[in-house]
Regions:
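Conserved structural motif at the start of ABC-family nucleotide-binding domains
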Residues: 3, 18-20
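The feature captures the beta-strand-to-loop junction immediately N-terminal to the Walker
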Residues: 34-36
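Helix-to-loop junction immediately C-terminal to a conserved catalytic motif
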Residues: 49
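ABC ATPase NBD Q-loop/coupling interface
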Residues: 58-73
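Conserved ABC ATPase "signature" region
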Residues: 111-126
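Catalytic Walker B motif of ABC-type/P-loop ATPase nucleotide-binding domains
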Residues: 157-158, 163-167
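ABC ATPase nucleotide-binding domains
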Residues: 230-231, 235-259
Length: 259
């Protein structure tokens, strides 16, 4: 079961933001979308998930146009954690997490799924707190926990699943960044196709099996970290002097200042 994009382009507010995208998203793999600001990363994620309509080309889930799949059915096939999370009402954390549980799940199972999601994301201590009293980083953690609840509820439907995370590590400390990315890798090991938008190239190199480097609305490089995280690849895409070095068994990126 794959998500396929063929000749895909997209526009937002009359501006062309994606063009000529051809790729497949595979199950059992973590794919990171990286690139400079305005490269089209979040738009590409939205197109893949079926939330943003492509201006041209085709986006298909196992051969079926993804936008033709009814929203309720689409929710059982993929989970999306969006970049922004605003909540003006004083819902408790457990209420927000339960909103991620699919309607098709029997009522008696919902509490078990919520409790499991809270445990898996180390958020049990927050379950009875109003979200309006949480910091931005804590709200980001709640948003991820809600996504986990949706994933766990979709297990009851025996459906192919994809997870889309838009900047999930923003506003988080290093410990919770690691937790989210480790969970993403665990979901891939369970057979999910995972797509993550990341600004931090070091996190992308550590967590991803595959990296798509975007620039100017196009995928300019597509491959494993060892082929994408290279000075000669990153420097022109980001228009910045970078150094890439090996340490602790992985690749790391640093910007050279003063050049």
């Amino acid at each position: 079961m794959t998500i396929s994009l063929r000749g895909v382009g997209a526009s937002l507010a009359g501006k062309r933001v994606l063009q000529g995208i051809d790729l497949q998203i595979l199950p059992g793999q973590v794919t990171a979308l990286v690139g400079p600001n305005g490269a089209g990363k979040s738009t590409l994620l939205g197109v893949m998930a079926g939330d943003i309509e492509a201006a041209d080309g085709e986006v298909a889930l196992h051969g079926s146009p993804i936008r033709s799949i009814p929203p309720k059915e689409r929710a059982s096939l993929r989970t999306v954690m969006r970049q922004s999370f605003e909540m003006s009402f004083a819902f408790l954390v457990r209420d927000i997490v339960e909103m991620g549980v699919l309607d098709q799940v029997p009522e008696r199972e919902k509490r078990h799924i919520v409790d499991r999601a809270l445990r898996e994301t180390e958020m049990t201590a927050f379950r009875n707190r109003p979200v309006t009293r949480l910091s931005g980083g804590e709200r980001q953690r709640v948003s991820f926990t809600r996504a986990v609840a949706q994933i766990r509820s979709s297990e009851h439907l025996d459906a192919p699943r994809f997870l889309f995370l838009d900047e999930p590590t923003a506003s988080l400390d290093m410990a919770y960044q690691a937790l989210i990315l480790n969970r993403a890798r665990s979901f891939a090991a369970e057979g999910l196709g995972v797509v993550i938008v990341l600004h931090d190239l070091n996190l992308a190199a550590a967590a991803a099996d595959r990296i798509l480097l975007l620039s100017g609305g196009r995928v300019v490089t597509d491959g494993p970290p060892e082929t994408v995280v290279r000075e000669e690849v990153l420097a022109p895409a980001f228009a910045a002097p970078v150094s890439v070095f090996e340490a602790d068994g992985g690749r790391h990126v640093a910007v050279r200042l003063g050049e």
